[in-house]
Amino acid sequence: MKRRFTLLGSVVALALSSTALASDAPASRGCADDAGWNDPAMPLKVYGNTWYVGTCGISALLVTSDAGHILVDAATPQAGPQILANIRALGFRPEDVRAIVFSHEHFDHAGSLAELQKATGAPVYARAPAIDTLKRGLPDRTDPQFEVAEPVAPVANIVTLADDGVVSVGPLALTAVASPGHTPGGTTWTWRSCEGDDCRQMVYADSLTAISDDVFRYSDDAAHPGYLAAFRNTLARVAALDCDILVTPHPSASGLWNRIGPSAAAPLMDTTACRRYAQGARQRLEKRLAEEAATSPSSGARP
């Protein structure tokens, strides 16, 4: 089975090695889809009061209001200073961030949660399956990538969020959509952003890739009861979302750099984007399940 999943280690190694030259990559040139996870990005308006404050390779969003702001995702352990600098560059104060939410409990998206919480004083909102991981700084065997997971700094001030909970700050209201699959605690977020009277439904859809270490099998319901069914339910829920503007934790997964910034050439809005994003993930999941079936003990094939 090891051969099937060596791609995961290669992808992580490539992404991390490409960050070594991050300080030499001028943010003003815009970002490429193959950018390193820590390559600096210009802060940009996405739409209305939603701003991109992440790196070229990993998303972070700031949703703003006069009553305070909500930060969405924390990127890698190295990205905290970039996120804070981008917030300030837009004219906002990190101290005015009143809540922090995130997509899922892996180091490339929760890596700077503790640092950003300390800088802002804001609580981190998390669904129950992610809380122990955030407190420990490491996942357990319920995470498909458990054996290759990188540690993060433990997070102290965590507010438990219902699967369909709402995080509110003044007029802002971000609604959680439980999205287990890539991780147990994965969460998609939806909210409204307006430019004048033109309001759009924003969707920050969690990663939906069926990637694991060499041990985890999505088809093994005895070892992971209900996990595959929950993953499939996630795909159905994301596909059905009211979705005008899609952003994903890895910006390249939703073609973000072709829609905002210096290289933008495609429309920002696409009401079919969430459906197509989920459909692609469903196809990859079915391919993964077929690979697992082909290497199961009953198939006669060697893992």
Which stretches of residues belong to each language-model region?
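Bacterial N-terminal signal peptides that target proteins for export
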Residues: 1-9
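Bacterial N-terminal signal peptides
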Residues: 9-18
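Metallo-beta-lactamase
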Residues: 23-32, 39-40, 45-48, 69, 76-78, 96, 156-157, 166-168, ...
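Conserved beta-strand hairpin/beta-sheet module of binuclear metal-dependent hydrolase folds
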Residues: 36-90, 94, 188-210
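Divalent metal-coordination and catalytic microenvironments
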Residues: 49, 63, 73, 83, ...
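Active-site HxH/HxHxD metal-binding segment of metal-dependent hydrolases
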Residues: 50, 78-81, 88-166, 266, ...
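C-terminal regulatory/interaction regions
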Residues: 267-303
